[in-house]
Amino acid sequence: MRLARSENRAYQLRLLEAYPLCQICERQQSIECHHVRYGRFGADKDDSKQIVVCRECHQWCHAHKKGSIEKYEEVADENWQRFGDC
């Protein structure tokens, strides 16, 4: 599901407010949102599939894309159920 840019940003801000720690390692430094499902250059990006991660875990997710999708999609789905009503 693609959201309008403003809706996606509102959703990301809700996630970052709700989760001040990385949802993978629970560190607090440099947290940001990561799209669990995304395609090359944004093709097939699913804005409803996002988790909050620190910079290190974000890099790990991109380096291990296949494993991270399966591992964190359930967390992303729970996030959307809780905060997806932008």
Feature map (PLM): residue ranges:
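Broad hydrophobic/π-residue packing in well-ordered secondary structure
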Residues: 12, 35, 66-69
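Short recognition patches in nucleic-acid-associated and regulatory proteins
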Residues: 30-41
